[in-house]
Amino acid sequence: MIQQESRLVVADNSGAKEALCIRVLGGTRKRYATVGDVIVVAIKSVIPASDVKKGAVSKAIIVRTKKEIRRPDGSYIRFDDNACVLLNAGGDIRGSRIFGPVARELRATNMKIVSLAPEVL
């Protein structure tokens, strides 16, 4: 469950390391975001000489959350961190690699993230 002011790890090679959620998209009263939701983030830390600049505002999709996700078969899955992947203006992912596992729930909407991920849980 990601809300405003939540800090997330950026799980791609776009150049950003950490992002801060500044808005959850999807309605006027939507407070929390989970895996597969799109949020607006501010970049808080970057690696040197990257295309992404500190303080830049971008859209991102959530790929991992610490809060467990209930699956239709009754099982739950949770991760060790909150992570996102940055999106460009067209809605495509900004980087060319994904780091760490991603949730299977992304298959319904984002096949590109699932195909680039090293592990899908």
Curated annotation (Swiss-Prot):
Pfam families the UniProt entry points to: Ribosomal_L14
Top-level taxon of the source organism: Bacteria
Record has Magnesium as a keyword: no
GO MF assignments: large ribosomal subunit rRNA binding; structural constituent of ribosome
GO biological process, alphabetically ordered: translation
Main function: Binds to 23S rRNA. Forms part of two intersubunit bridges in the 70S ribosome.
Full protein name: Large ribosomal subunit protein uL14
